[in-house]
Amino acid sequence: MFVWGKNDLNPEQEKAIYNENSILLIACPGSGKTRTITYKIAYELSKLESNKQYIVAITYTNRAADEIKERIELLGVDTEQLWIGTIHSFCVEWILKPYHMYIEELRFGYDIINTNDTENYLVSLCASYSTPKKKITYWDCLCYCFTSEGLKINCTKPTIKETVELIIRDYYQNLKEKHEIDYELILYYSYCLLKENKSICKTLSNIFPYILIDEYQDTKELQYMILGAILKTGKENKAFIVGDPNQSIYGNLGGFPMDKAQLENVTGLYYDELSLSYNYRSSSLLVSYFDYFKTYANKIEAVGKTKDYQSVISYNKTVSVEDLENEIVRVIKTNIDEYRISPNEICILAPQWIHLSGLTRNLMARLPQYSFDGPGMAPFARDIDNFWYKLSRIILTDSTPGLYIRRLRWASEIVTNLLSIGVTNIDLSAKQILYICNSISINEQDGLEYLKKFFDAFLERVNIDINQNKYLKMHYDAFLIALKNVLIV
């Protein structure tokens, strides 16, 4: 049984972990949510009685999944029986890959397109439908999602509503003809399979006796229905659902927090509702100010080292959009030079990532002495399921002891990917993949050319002909096109 030190967790966190029932955990900002999830997973892994069962953890991003898994491994816990990742990755691996033949549109195979492909398709359709008097953009078309009832389009601009609906329906008709699916269809087809084939639900409920869901406040209706279908079918299945309704930021994309009664109806489980109310990150002034923006009444208490810090809260109503960048530069320099705030403790937020993409690059040019992490920094970050993106993570990180576990896990993904696409003429372990990558030396200053030459050297070392594998070639072309497009911007 997994045990932890006396001061590793606070009483609220321990209560959530030790509870044997299904849990709805409302975790305020800075409350140690990730730490609680990490220890809960480790605890449940130690309780598994069969090597055929898995604990599954659904995270909102792949970065969150990597962080949690790495934390568990650092605790010395074996993660062989843990599956952790996004809901889309879960659906592809456990529902679509083994059962897609039961969907008429997918039974002869399918290709998964990425967000860059979707954008290119929609941009092309927008251009064909636009007129000099009625111009329609890609952003106008981001008003659709799939629910359990099918495609829903919610264009709020009356003058282009009808045309936008035509564009989106044409987009999905084109995907159907090409046997392609996007992230929305991944969810919809997965739901359809579970709805029409109860035996699939039964199989998955036997494999996954315990399901954890992180950031549940941004979960879509289809995602609730997919996980609910699995949980409802099992006899003794349990769920650990974590999030904060006050932090829901994807309502416009269909994400919303279900209340306890709704969750119980969808999953067929009874939940103990618990909370994490201690904020270790912010000052008391910031915590109090947050009360003005709450939509869900919960208790938050600042208890960290910075609880007495005299935060400055200001609202600039006069800066123009043309001068916004200059003002942000001024604020950054003021906080670093005058208030002695560490650069890695400064965060810039915006309503959408697109608002930050150009800004990030401009700030890098104007403040080269500081390191930035944000949209536009990693040109392939939006294509996390691409094989060459996964390989690039290994290529572009140092082979240091501190990164060994993470890079070894990435190498394991490479091995799994190669086997899943039918590359059986090689016999490589994750350690051998790492050794090959570490031994390749490329003398090239241009980033794009460096990666291309590294890819060529890697393929030669592992004896793979990319032109003989449709999957690798398709991902290679898509990866380089996306990379070139970002570098041109």
State where each predicted segment sits:
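Helicase P-loop NTPase motor core
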Residues: 269-272, 278-367
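Walker B catalytic acidic pair
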Residues: 215
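Accessory N-terminal region flanking or inserted into the helicase ATPase core
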Residues: 1-26, 31, 35-36, 54-56, ...
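Coupling/switch/interface segments within P-loop NTPase motor domains and analogous charged loops
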Residues: 104-177, 427-473
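Core RecA-like ATPase module of SF1/SF2 helicases and allied nucleic-acid translocases
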Residues: 344-489
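Conserved RecA-like helicase ATPase core segment
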Residues: 101, 221-222, 226-308
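P-loop NTPase Walker
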Residues: 1-102, 202
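Short, polar/flexible loop-turn hinges at active-site or ligand-entry regions and domain interfaces
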Residues: 50-53, 75-82, 98-113, 128-134, ...
